[in-house]
């Protein structure tokens, strides 16, 4: 009986830590991905972006879903404030690049101001310690189109030019996530 309890406890510990998001002070995994800005695909490199300053890397479940639409819109309308604080922003989801081309140009969401990157197999999200769930049969977006891909957790990482995570923000509403992220980025310069 004790052996069974020990085994269950060990498995639970592995399961919990397997999806523990990176914390402040940890090295942020570098990544390169296809991304889109204002409907145009390009090759994104976190290492190159960090040469210009702090980078907000925010993971979201899927383009054109309720919470993600709100979050993208809020990042987009606050982009000048992020830039003034010395930060750029990149959204990351398991959406394919064609879908992100539409999302990045959509005037209601990214509005051409917010770059979004494609992580089709979830490997970038997993490298940040995030849980990636499989596709849900029949799941549709706010446009009524089938989503057809998996989902990463909604978590935001603020990565400083030295490649370290300054703060991890998760477990809050999409709008609150953006507000907290902006406040944290602005606080880095004080």
Can you say where each PLM-predicted feature lies in the sequence?
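Thiol-/selenol-based redox modules, centered on thioredoxin-like
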Residues: 141-190
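Structural micro-motif
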Residues: 111-114, 130-138, 149-157
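Structural microenvironment flanking redox-active thiols in thiol-disulfide oxidoreductases
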Residues: 69-127
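A short beta-strand-turn-helix
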Residues: 32-54
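N-proximal helix/coil linker or "cap" segments that precede and/or mark the start of modular domains
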Residues: 5-35
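Short active-site neighborhood of thiol/selenol oxidoreductases, capturing the structured segment around
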Residues: 46-75
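Residue-level recognition of short loop/turn positions
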Residues: 37-38, 121, 162
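Residue-level structural signal for beta-strand termini and adjacent loop
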Residues: 46-47, 130, 171
């Amino acid at each position: 009986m004790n052996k069974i309890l020990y085994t269950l406890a060990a498995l639970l510990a592995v399961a919990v830590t397997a999806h523990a998001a990176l914390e402040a002070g940890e090295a942020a995994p570098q990544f390169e991905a296809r991304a889109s800005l204002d409907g145009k695909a390009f090759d994104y490199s976190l290492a190159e972006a960090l040469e210009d300053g702090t980078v907000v890397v925010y993971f979201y479940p899927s383009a054109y879903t309720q919470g993600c639409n709100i979050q993208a819109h809020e990042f987009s309308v606050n982009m000048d404030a992020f830039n003034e604080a010395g930060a750029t922003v990149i959204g990351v989801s398991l959406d394919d690049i064609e879908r992100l081309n539409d999302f990045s140009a959509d005037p209601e969401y990214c509005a051409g101001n917010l770059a979004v990157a494609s992580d089709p197999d979830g490997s970038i999200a997993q490298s940040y310690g995030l849980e990636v769930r499989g596709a849900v049969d029949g799941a549709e977006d706010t446009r009524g189109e089938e989503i057809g891909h998996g989902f990463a957790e909604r978590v935001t990482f603020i990565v400083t030019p030295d490649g370290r995570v300054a703060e991890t923000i998760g477990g809050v509403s999409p709008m609150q996530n953006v507000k907290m992220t902006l406040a944290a980025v602005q606080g880095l310069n004080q």
